[in-house]
A protein has these predicted regions:
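Helical element adjacent to the flavin cofactor pocket in flavoenzyme catalytic cores
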Residues: 4-67
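Well-ordered beta-strand positions enriched in small/hydrophobic/aromatic, beta-favoring residues
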Residues: 8-9, 56, 97, 110, ...
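Mid-domain beta-loop-alpha active-site segment that forms a flexible
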Residues: 10-27, 74-75, 145-152, 202, ...
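C-terminal catalytic lobe of FAD-dependent flavoproteins
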Residues: 19, 113-114, 154-236
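Active-site catalytic microenvironments for nucleophilic, acid-base chemistry
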Residues: 29, 82, 216-220
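Short, conserved active-site loop motifs that form the nucleotide-linked donor/cofactor pocket
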Residues: 34-36, 126, 192
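Hydrophobic/aromatic beta-strand patches that form the interior of the parallel beta-sheet core
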Residues: 38, 69, 193-195
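Active-site substrate-recognition segment that forms the wall
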Residues: 45, 52-53, 62-190
Length: 236
């Protein structure tokens, strides 16, 4: 860190994951457990009648369903809209840039609080991520946004001069008006469950959300109280 630094908080249990490696492992474990995954297939609509969804319409045909979980991130509202179900989820664009040859760069994952930049280290790679542009639904990389990330990080960190940029990305975070996710059954469709709107902490809250949704579908007591995340809270 560059001077001056007024203070910092160290969380010994904090960790970071490599996104593509995590997804590969999730795919492996899901298929081992019996899940069917359809790569490159678009879900375009949900069909239903009399308060129950019957099928998910996809680019490879309809898939019959006893329950439908809409966990489509920033696109959840579009999918729910095909059922006439209003879902208050908006997109917030974020950007990231990854460098190689990060010897001498920070070894510990950190958040630069004042600048809202996340710093992650994967072996000899360094990744910077940030920005929260609400209403921007583009997944195109903004050079201005990425250059801004690099400038903010350079103000706070002693970065090696020979860093090699290897990747720029932009993605969409699903956000709700009150900052809390939507987890639970929709108001009009008894077998349609929302699991979206986690904003900046989708990876953190994803496992717990998945378990609670599975328990809800099976008629079990969820691991935590879902009432505060009830999608109907915006329609009361």
């Amino acid at each position: 860190l560059k001077s001056p630094v007024a203070g910092a908080v160290f969380f010994a249990d904090d960790a970071c994951v490599h996104p593509s490696q995590l997804l590969a492992e999730l795919e492996r474990q899901a298929t081992t457990a019996g899940a069917q995954l359809f790569a490159g297939v678009d879900a375009t609509a949900v069909r239903g009648s009399n308060g129950r969804a019957h099928a998910v319409c996809t680019s490879m045909g309809d898939i019959a369903a006893g329950h439908v979980v809409i966990a489509a991130g920033a696109w959840s509202a579009e999918l729910a809209r095909t059922l006439g179900e209003p879902v208050p989820v908006e997109a917030a664009q974020g950007s990231s840039v990854t460098f190689q040859r990060a010897e001498g760069a920070p070894r510990q994952a950190m958040l630069l609080g004042e600048d809202h930049v996340a710093v992650a280290r994967y072996g000899d790679h360094l990744r910077l991520a940030g920005w929260f542009r609400i209403g921007n639904r583009s997944t195109a990389v903004s050079d201005k946004a990425v250059d801004g990330l690099k400038a903010l990080a350079a103000r706070r960190l002693e970065l090696p001069p020979d860093l090699i940029e290897v990747n720029r990305q932009a993605g969409l975070r699903p956000v709700t008006p009150d900052g809390l996710p939507l987890i639970g059954t929709t108001a009009r469709w008894h077998n349609v469950i929302l699991a979206t709107g986690h904003g900046l902490v989708g990876l953190t809250m994803g496992p717990g959300t998945g378990r609670a949704v599975a328990q809800h579908i099976l008629g079990e007591q969820p691991a935590f109280d879902l009432d505060r995340f009830n999608p109907a809270r915006f329609h009361r």
